[in-house]
Amino acid sequence: MTIEVRNLVKKFGSFAALDGVNLKVDNGELLALLGPSGSGKTTLLRIIAGLDWPDSGEVSFNGEDALAQGARERHVGFVFQHYALFRHMTVFENVAFGLRVQPRAVRKEEARIRARVKELLDLVQLDWLADRYPSQLSGGQRQRIALARALAIEPRILLLDEPFGALDAKVRKELRKWLRSLHHEINVTSIFVTHDQEEALEVANRVVVMDKGRIEQIGSPEDVYESPATAFVHGFIGESIELPVRIDDGVVRLGERPLRLAADGLAPGASRLFVRRHDMLVGPPGTGAFEGAVRHVRNFGPVQRAEVALFGGETIEIDAPRDRELRAGDRVGLEPRRYRIFAG
């Protein structure tokens, strides 16, 4: 099932939740909508599901107008952050629910329903919990059951709204790998919403980065991380250093200090320099584009996170290998291995 969104606009009063969004999701794709709160990602998901309606624009499934259909007719499976399981039903009954409430004309006979539920519980590797109630399950188990229930009706599209947001970090990491593997098995066109960049980069085939109701960039996880298209994407994905610089006569300046950085093709005026923390290489004073003094050092597993006061007035944090053995008071030269400069 392919999904296409064209010029989608949705406002809540004067607030534009979606501002001219265009997007195509390919058949069998696992796509992540990534962005901060208020970026429009959940609003977009709800409109695709038929749970909300745009002020203008088009949504099509395989070329057919989806906005002419209600939520039931769209045949979409939806997984919420907080499971939405029925507490008074067993795991088996929860998964069977969607099949048992289908219109009589399309409802399967009970034996086929039971076979389908067993198949799904095997798929999510929780067949041994069929007779348990939601209160007897862990958070990760509940979310797997919620996903099995969404798949029971054999949806054309699977939508997931912050599916792992209510789980602890260890369980979230386990379920990311599981979801990627499961999607490979079921091959259903799927979209999931998240504000967790690590989750989006690890799970999705493509990532859509959103901010303020607009799409900032669409690309593979590698593309959006290695080649951010805008200052917002660079600042939102990964841990970046951001410095206010100016381009004057082909020279990059931090305050009044010229930096030995290429400025070819950059327009003169105020700009922003972005460098990943781990891309700032540490050397002796005088050896890099920047110089500064180490103020404070903290150890994080294999790296040191050092706070460095630059000779130019700015203070930054860098990540260096532990064997570099930085100490407070050290004077250092810093050379960005990779960097991007954006106007504005």
Curated annotation (Swiss-Prot):
Keywords of this entry? ATP-binding, Cell inner membrane, Cell membrane, Membrane, Nucleotide-binding, Sulfate transport, Translocase, Transport
Membrane-related topology note: Peripheral membrane protein
Q: Which reaction does it catalyse?
A: sulfate(out) + ATP + H2O = sulfate(in) + ADP + phosphate + H(+); thiosulfate(out) + ATP + H2O = thiosulfate(in) + ADP + phosphate + H(+)
Which Gene Ontology cellular component terms are annotated? ATP-binding cassette (ABC) transporter complex
Q: Which domain of life is it from?
A: Bacteria
EC assignment: 7.3.2.3
Q: Does the keyword Cytoplasm apply?
A: no
Q: SMART domains recorded for this chain?
A: AAA
Location in or out of the cell: Cell inner membrane
Residues the record lists as binding ATP? 35-42
- Tell me the ranges covered by the ABC transporter domain, including all copies: 3-237
What range does the record give for the signal peptide? none
Annotated SUPFAM superfamilies: MOP-like, P-loop containing nucleoside triphosphate hydrolases
> Which biological process annotations from GO are given for this protein?
sulfate transmembrane transport
Cross-referenced CDD domains? ABC_CysA_sulfate_importer (cd03296)
Query: A single GO molecular function, which one?
Result: ABC-type thiosulfate transporter activity
Record has Disulfide bond as a keyword: no
Known function: Part of the ABC transporter complex CysAWTP involved in sulfate/thiosulfate import. Responsible for energy coupling to the transport system.
Q: Which family does it belong to?
A: Belongs to the ABC transporter superfamily. Sulfate/tungstate importer (TC 3.A.1.6) family.
Q: How does it assemble?
A: The complex is composed of two ATP-binding proteins (CysA), two transmembrane proteins (CysT and CysW) and a solute-binding protein (CysP).
What NCBIfam families is this protein classified in?
3a0106s01
Q: What is this protein called?
A: Sulfate/thiosulfate import ATP-binding protein CysA
Taxonomic lineage is:
Bacteria, Pseudomonadati, Pseudomonadota, Alphaproteobacteria, Hyphomicrobiales
